[in-house]
A protein has these predicted regions:
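Short secondary-structure boundary segments
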Residues: 9, 34, 78, 95-97, ...
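Glycine-rich phosphate-binding active-site loops on the catalytic face of alpha/beta enzymes
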Residues: 74-85, 112-125, 158-192
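N-terminal active-site wall of soluble small-molecule enzyme domains
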Residues: 23, 27-87
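Alpha-helix-loop-beta-strand connector modules within alpha/beta enzyme cores
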Residues: 43-59, 86-98, 127-149, 155, ...
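Active-site mouth loops of central-metabolism enzymes
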Residues: 1-16, 92-95, 148-149
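Alpha/beta enzyme core
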Residues: 16-28, 79, 101-113, 160-163
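Active-site pocket-lining/capping segments in soluble small-molecule metabolic enzymes
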Residues: 1, 7-10, 76, 114, ...
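Catalytic cores of alpha/beta
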Residues: 57-72, 76, 96-108, 137-143, ...
Length: 196
């Protein structure tokens, strides 16, 4: 299974250093998501990421920068729903309902489905997918290797995802909540990697 880390929505001091550290310790893919960012700040963060890792970075905002920096991919969402002209990389998309999953899954290289569990980073953003619903979606081939689980993913529940057929997991709050303690941050990342 693929482990994807998605950034916090806001910038913070030392963020690029932690991103590079994750890549140095085997991070397969990073989704850079800064919904309220201006282009200059967003691009500045990209420039602070070691260019050898650009082939593992997908961006949710300012998609034309994916072309400029030859990044791995872009992630479409309600704010940014079209790929930029000339972009030939990976295209993924956020999905939140069974109807969206059924209609749109095949249009993209991969999709995220959320929230699978109650969100760690968004208070009150609770899962709409019970274990029986997830089993049904797997049995109907709606969840497969192209569907990435998002929402409430922690080191405690990540190991349950393969039974539902997910191709990977995207983690946000459970990891970034530890950003103030580099050792605990890296230890938690390693726990996620080992359990996936």
């Amino acid at each position: 299974m693929l482990l994807i880390i998605i950034t916090e929505p806001g910038f913070f001091d030392g963020e690029a250093g932690l991103i590079n550290l994750l890549f140095e310790h085997g991070l397969q893919r990073l989704h850079l998501r800064k919904p309220d960012s201006n282009e200059a700040d967003f691009e500045s963060l990209i420039k602070q990421i070691n260019p050898q890792f650009y082939n593992r970075v997908a961006i949710h905002d300012h998609h034309h920068l994916a072309v400029r920096y030859n990044l791995f991919g872009i992630h479409l969402n309600r704010r940014n729903s079209l790929a930029p002209d000339g972009f030939c990389g990976s295209v993924s998309r956020s999905l939140h309902t069974i109807e969206e999953l059924s209609a749109d899954k095949q249009k993209y290289d991969y999709v995220t489905l959320s929230p699978i569990f109650d969100s760690v980073s968004k208070v009150g953003y609770n899962s709409q997918f019970t274990p029986s619903v997830l089993n049904d979606l797997r049995d109907r081939n709606l969840i497969d290797s192209h569907v990435i689980a998002l929402g409430g993913i922690t080191a405690y529940n990540i190991a349950t995802l393969p039974q539902y057929g997910f191709g990977g997991a995207m983690v946000l709050g459970a990891l970034w909540n530890l950003k103030g303690d580099r050792e605990m941050f890296l230890e938690y990342f390693e726990r996620l990697r080992k359990k996936i």
